[in-house]
Amino acid sequence: MAQQPKPVRRIVCIDDNDSEKSKCISDAPSPDVRLDPARPGYASTRIWVTDRPPGRLKNVRESLNAPHTIEPPPGGSVCRVVTFPPDASYKGRVGAKEVQAFFAAMGSPAASTYSAKAPHPYMQKTRTLDFCLILEGEITLVLDKEEVHLKAGDTVVQRGTNHAWSNRSD
């Protein structure tokens, strides 16, 4: 049985409208988590979403009310924490149907570049600039021409390339 992903603590701070003093309005696990039934242990946890740069600072409502998609809103941004289960827990049991269902559920069906010949079933490509920080453990960035082994503290700048993330641990 796959281990449940660890909740991600989300702290949201603002300046009080009346006193202009800073305070926390939320300190709890992020309420916006999407799982993938085909990959037990996978979790996409959104922390914050903006609908335009640089993001409003005053009179902002909860940002997670926007649809939970892979791509940010047009002109906006998204901060998320993703947990990847070991590939062994799903690889060989996941095909086009499951992968397409995942990308459709995440609001980005066109992002999937699934092919039976692809180096990983969850290959994807979006027109986004992604900053990926490895928080713990190790993971492999799968690209069309190569793979890059990453460890905690490594950072990837993903510039709209075809890629997947592969957790090759037990």
Residue ranges, per PLM feature:
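A short beta-strand-loop-beta hairpin characteristic of the jelly-roll/cupin
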Residues: A118-A152
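Terminal, intrinsically disordered low-complexity segments enriched in charged/polar
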Residues: R46-I70, V78-F84, K91-V94, A101
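N-terminal leader/capping segments at the start of a protein or of a new domain
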Residues: M1-S63
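Conserved short histidine dyad/triad with adjacent acidic residue
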Residues: P29-S30, V78-T126, R159-N162
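Short Gly/Pro-enriched turn/cap motifs at secondary-structure boundaries
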Residues: A2-Q3, I70, P121-M123
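Structural motif
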Residues: K21, E138, N162-A164
